[in-house]
Structure formats: structure tokens, C-alpha cells
Amino acid sequence: MGKIRVRNNNAASDAEVRNTVFKFNKDFGQHILKNPLVAQGIVDKADLKQSDTVLEVGPGTGNLTVRMLEKARKVIAVEMDPRMAAEITKRVQGTPKEKKLQVVLGDVIKTDLPYFDVCVSNTPYQISSPLVFKLLQQRPAPRAAILMFQREFALRLVARPGDPLYCRLSANVQMWAHVKHIMKVGKNNFRPPPLVESSVVRIEPKNPPPPLAFEEWDGLLRIVFLRKNKTIGACFKTSSIIEMVENNYRTWCSQNERMVEEDFDVKSLIDGVLQQCNLQDARASKCGQTEFLSLLHAFHQVGVHFA
């Protein structure tokens, strides 16, 4: 990362927070970003506009918040720890930034989110995946999310078919958004330091979103990534999967007033779809959106759904 200039008033604010004594709560995954250069770099990468409303998840003591308040129209900061919420409120009290800040005390995963343009988060690692999917299902979709994650999680988000870290998370997120790794952040940039290195990614939800039900896409991926290096054909030979496919098919037939043939054989149905797509010997770890969409469409054509 190149050298970044930091405004003096922010540096003073950071010094103030460094002198604040907190007993950090491990249950909340609290690791405060203390490096002003990194904080400024993250805000710069967000490309905020003066008209933007920003959702910040886990603001901590507000080192990112005060910088975003200089650029955006409003910042909605969602924080679980009342002490942190009080600290961030105190930092802007009596300043022009006070009117631009809304602090929401609670769990962001369980909170109905208001409209926002951009999300910025030094994400508590234990909510990484739930937060990503909550943001991707937000409507109207935000323009972008700039999110700090554990390094390995971030690399899974951007992994491509054939990469060692490519997984269901990769395929799922990349269907709904464009994802880019933008910054590495060492653990010594936090207080207290986490056990692992971190990375920042930029997620831009596709607009309009794909004409596809999330539950259907996710349902198929859960099957083919059961063992990502096994063949897709082998994944569909699992007894629990065979039973699920048959139950879903019979439900679809009932809903569409179609009779199930007396000699119906779900294994033959599955084999026929896999052969039609030429994916029986393929492995999910090597397949991309084109292959998975083809498979999902073929199953839908014969009345098999996954939601």
C-alpha cells in the first residue's frame, strides 16, 4: 500500500483513543484498528460521495467513523458494545459531525437495516459469512461494501475455480457480486492484535441481481460442495441427497397436479440430468457459474428444486 497522508485532526483523535482504557470483549471479536494510515486507506478505497449514507458495522472507538463523517452525508454505526457506542458518541459530541452520526446499539445480523449506499466494516470475524450474505440480500442493494476480514476468509471470497481456497462461499458470493481484494492488513495494526492476518475486500453487488432465487442456488451448491474434490455424480449418490431430491420432486408434482409414475426412479432422473450436462465426472472445485447454472436449469426442467 502506498504512503497515505493523514489529516492532523484525525491524528489527534487517534491519539486520544489510544489513551482510552477498555477491557476488550472477546465474545464481540473486538480488535480496534489503531493504525491511522490503514484507517485512512480503507476510507479512501470506499470512494464516498458527499450524498452517501454509510453503514458501519462494528465501529469500535470510531477511528474509521470520524474519517467517514468528513466525507459522507451520514454514518449509521451499528455496535453491540454499549461502552463503544458511548465512546464513539463522545468523540463527535459538540462538533459538526454529531448531527451526521446515528449510533444503533444491537446485533447487525438481527437488525432490520435502513437504506444505505456503502457499507464499511472492520468485521468481527465470527459474523463474517452472515454479514456478507445479509448485505447481498439487502434491497435496494448498496453500491459497494468495503470489509475487513480474516485473511483466509477474504481469499476464499475472491478464489476462482481451480484455486485451492475455492469453495461454496466463493461460488455463492461471486454469483451475486463482483469481489476484489484491495489491501492486506497485518495483525500489529490492531489493539489487541488478533491471532491471524487480515485483508480488506471490496464487494459490489450486481445490479440488477441475477434472475435467480438465492435459496435455489445455495441449495444446489450445498450438495455439489459436500466434498468439493469428489465428482458431482458421487455427491448426488449420497443417500440423504437422493431422499431429498425425491421428496422435492414429489412435492413439485403435487403442487403442479402431476402424477408420479409408478415406476419412477429418482436415481435414473438424477443420472439423466448429470449426463445431459456432462457433469457426472466433474468436480465442484473446478466448476464455475456456467456449469452450476446449467445444472440447476436442467434439474428445474425435470421438476427438481432445491429450496
Curated annotation (Swiss-Prot):
It comes from Schizosaccharomyces pombe (strain 972 / ATCC 24843) (Fission yeast). It comes from the Eukaryota. Belongs to the class I-like SAM-binding methyltransferase superfamily. rRNA adenine N(6)-methyltransferase family. One of its GO terms (molecular function) is RNA binding. This is Dimethyladenosine transferase. SUPFAM superfamilies: S-adenosyl-L-methionine-dependent methyltransferases. It catalyses: adenosine(1779)/adenosine(1780) in 18S rRNA + 4 S-adenosyl-L-methionine = N(6)-dimethyladenosine(1779)/N(6)-dimethyladenosine(1780) in 18S rRNA + 4 S-adenosyl-L-homocysteine + 4 H(+). PROSITE patterns: RRNA_A_DIMETH, SAM_RNA_A_N6_MT. Pfam families: RrnaAD. GO terms for cellular component: mitotic spindle; nucleolus; nucleus. Specifically dimethylates two adjacent adenosines in the loop of a conserved hairpin near the 3'-end of 18S rRNA in the 40S particle. Its EC number is 2.1.1.183. The gene is dim1. S-adenosyl-L-methionine binds at residues 31, 33, 58, 79, 107, 122. The keyword Transcription regulation does not apply. The keyword rRNA processing applies. Keywords: Methyltransferase, RNA-binding, rRNA processing, S-adenosyl-L-methionine, Transferase. GO terms for biological process: maturation of SSU-rRNA from tricistronic rRNA transcript (SSU-rRNA, 5.8S rRNA, LSU-rRNA); rRNA methylation.
